[in-house]
Amino acid sequence: MVKKLNLFISLILVIAVKGEDVETAVNKILPPGMQVQAIADSNIDGIKVVDIGELQPIYVTEDGKYFFYGELYSINESSINNLTDQAKRDKRADLIASNLSSADYITFPAKRAKHEITVFTDVDCGYCRKFHSEIEDYNEIGITVNYVAFPRSGPDSSSYNKIVGAWCSADPKKILTEQKKGEEPKISMCEDNPVMEHFMLGQKIGITGTPAIISKSGALFPGYLPASDLFSRLEASES
């Protein structure tokens, strides 16, 4: 969908739409199946932030005549802030909160949790295995890890079926751990599993590789990070 939208926008960026209300104007130029979800004021007078159901918003003039699709920055005395990145973080956090519950996760809790993360994982991913081999380090430092499934090879693949087996197990933590050690524990399949929903959610919020670590505030940390480094980044992102 993102590629489709990027291609579509590349064709119409130089075209101004007729003056009309923002929602009507934007809906007319969106690809089929997409529509405006929400409209909010931006930090710039006369510019609206428009949520079109993707992670990336678009920015539209109040009269609906012009828009741009890209990064919006604010310039302060001593820094430059990426306002679009903050909007993406907020959107990620909202999508995770509204689509996932505790029943969706395979959770490895910290005894004294200071941070809680959502980790999109694949049982056959090398760095996912490395991350999980250090799960006690993350828990010990105060990070609760909530795993969700993101089999990179997609539905009906070996990795997909393996991770479905973990979620269907009577002891998901045990099976997931064994799989990430390269073992092949006996698994059972079930229809009532959240793996496809996890996979589709990951695609919607822009996950392209694993492990993909997301903080409670929606900050994305792609790839493996040692416990101490991750903790430092979480502290900085939540401050």
Language-model segments: which ranges?
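Sec-dependent signal peptide recognition
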Residues: 2-10
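Hydrophobic h-region of N-terminal signal peptides that target proteins for export
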Residues: 10-18
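Short, non-transmembrane alpha-helical segments in secretory-pathway proteins
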Residues: 18-35
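Thiol/selenol-based redox catalytic cores and closely related redox-interacting motifs
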Residues: 35-38, 45-51, 56-59, 63-80, ...
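Extended, non-globular interaction scaffolds
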Residues: 85-88
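A short beta-strand-turn-helix
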Residues: 97-115
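Short active-site neighborhood of thiol/selenol oxidoreductases, capturing the structured segment around
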Residues: 109-129, 145
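Structural microenvironment flanking redox-active thiols in thiol-disulfide oxidoreductases
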Residues: 137-168
